[in-house]
Swiss-Prot record:
Its EC number is 3.1.26.5. The gene is rnpA. RNaseP catalyzes the removal of the 5'-leader sequence from pre-tRNA to produce the mature 5'-terminus. It can also cleave other RNA substrates such as 4.5S RNA. The protein component plays an auxiliary but essential role in vivo by binding to the 5'-leader sequence and broadening the substrate specificity of the ribozyme. Keywords: Endonuclease, Hydrolase, Nuclease, RNA-binding, tRNA processing. Belongs to the RnpA family. This is Ribonuclease P protein component.
Amino acid sequence: MSQIVTLKKNYQFRRVFRYGQSYATKYIVLFVLENSLNINRVGFSVGKKVGNSVTRNRVKRLLREVYRLNNPNMMQGYDLILLARFRADELDYHKCQREFIRLTKKSKLLQKNVI
């Protein structure tokens, strides 16, 4: 099982929000900022407007799993933030997967030989 390297500190999130490029779909916003490492670091954020705490945690688990499965197919060396939008509580696994693939294609993070 692959380990996900996460953004944990507030300053890390602020840097990506401030200087990163954003790509959005109906349910998810992806913020991307190049880092000087050869790995991707990712942060997950679900605001309080998305359901109750159980729903927010479910959405975070969905995002984390979709990222974990697709990270090997992505370009490395980026800090990413996956931000769930207001209607993200409507997501199921397959819809979340489609949205994530759409965002990675839009941001050119998906490697060319995949999908």
